[in-house]
């Protein structure tokens, strides 16, 4: 238990230090429709000076996974489109559901999408309670149990084959409403191009006002 606590303390410390550099990602975030204020709410940061063990993530956007007990994981996204891999995780870390705090904040329904930036776009830019998984292939059985009490689960399907397969597989397990993005689009790119009402229209929410 002590080892787990010290690991959490290190993750919290790293998150705080990386947050101080978020201004370095301002142009990138603006291109994704994410303001610095929203980035701060999500506790995003930049690895300007790497903490011990994070040397391989230098220059990347840091994305903390936050639960009621604090920061439990960090993932890192390249700010340079030419640099692969686009996303990197902590060595030996298992994939986790992102933004789980929204499960308690949500009412009768919740959204699910791929990727942390899509989740931030829905949850903090548009105001749609939402959780995310880092890729279509990382869904786990216990995620289904976490969402089993919702009357409706909006699954935001990226406009590619893996996205469609992700939505279809969830529809076998949960009361799903599939919200399909256009070909080659995802939640974030659709929001940047067309705005929040476009997403809400696709969900049918604007009709319910």
Identify the residue ranges that each predicted region occupies.
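TOPRIM metal-binding catalytic domain and adjacent DNA-binding surface shared by DnaG-type primases
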Residues: 1-62, 67-68, 104-105, 203-209
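Phosphate-handling DNA/RNA-contact segment within nucleic-acid enzymes
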Residues: 49-152, 166-167
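Short, surface-exposed amphipathic charged segments that create phosphate/polyanion-binding patches used
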Residues: 60, 145-150, 186-200
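Acidic beta-strand-to-loop metal/phosphate-binding motif
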Residues: 112, 150-162, 180
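Short, acidic/turn-prone active-site loops that include or flank metal/cofactor-
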Residues: 133-139, 158-161, 181-184
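Switch/connector loops and helix/strand junctions flanking conserved nucleotide-binding motifs
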Residues: 163-165, 189
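Short, aromatic/basic amphipathic alpha-helical patches
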Residues: 165-174
């Amino acid at each position: 238990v002590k080892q787990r606590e010290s690991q959490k303390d290190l993750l919290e410390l790293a998150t705080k230090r990386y947050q101080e550099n978020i201004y370095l990602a301002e142009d990138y975030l603006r291109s994704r429709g994410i303001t610095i204020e929203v980035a701060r709410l999500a506790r995003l940061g930049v690895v300007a000076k790497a903490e011990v063990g994070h040397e391989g993530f230098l220059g990347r956007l840091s994305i903390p996974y936050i639960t009621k007990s604090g920061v439990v994981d960090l993932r890192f996204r390249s700010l340079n489109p030419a640099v692969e891999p686009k996303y990197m995780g902590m060595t030996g870390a298992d994939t986790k559901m992102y933004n789980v705090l929204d499960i308690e904040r949500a009412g009768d329904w919740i959204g699910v999408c791929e990727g942390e930036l899509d989740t931030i776009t829905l949850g903090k830019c548009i105001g749609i309670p939402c959780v995310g998984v880092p890729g279509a292939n990382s869904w786990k059985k216990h995620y289904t149990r976490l969402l089993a009490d919702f009357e409706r689960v909006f699954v935001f399907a990226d406009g590619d084959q893996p996205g469609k397969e992700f939505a279809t597989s969830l529809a076998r397990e949960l009361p799903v409403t599939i919200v399909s993005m256009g070909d080659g689009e995802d939640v974030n790119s659709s929001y940047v191009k067309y705005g929040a009402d476009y997403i809400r229209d696709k969900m049918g929410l604007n009709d319910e006002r």
